[in-house]
Amino acid sequence: MFTRRLGPDPHANGASTPSLRGCPDILEMETGDFAVIGKDITGEAANRLIAGASCGPDERIVWIPRKTLVLAKSDIPEGA
């Protein structure tokens, strides 16, 4: 299902988080799509989305720290 992590391991170099099961992460899937592990903020953010954005009943708005995405940038493939 998942082929690799984009960006560094959130626990690398002894980084501490509340638990090994509670870290933001970006994973590439076998299909080439991506999965994001983060905090579900759908309840508080769904009514505050920018114009043209929407969240369907089977979707969630997920928050990840800026640092997580910035550090993954070099691992994100170019093109479609």
Each model region followed by its residue ranges:
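Short, charged/polar N-terminal "headpieces" of proteins
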Residues: 1-23
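Generic secondary-structure microfeatures
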Residues: 7-10, 30, 38-40, 68
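C-terminal structural segments of small proteins and small subunits
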Residues: 53-80
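A short, structured beta-strand/loop element
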Residues: 16-59
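Residues in well-ordered beta-strands of folded domains
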Residues: 4-7, 27, 37, 63
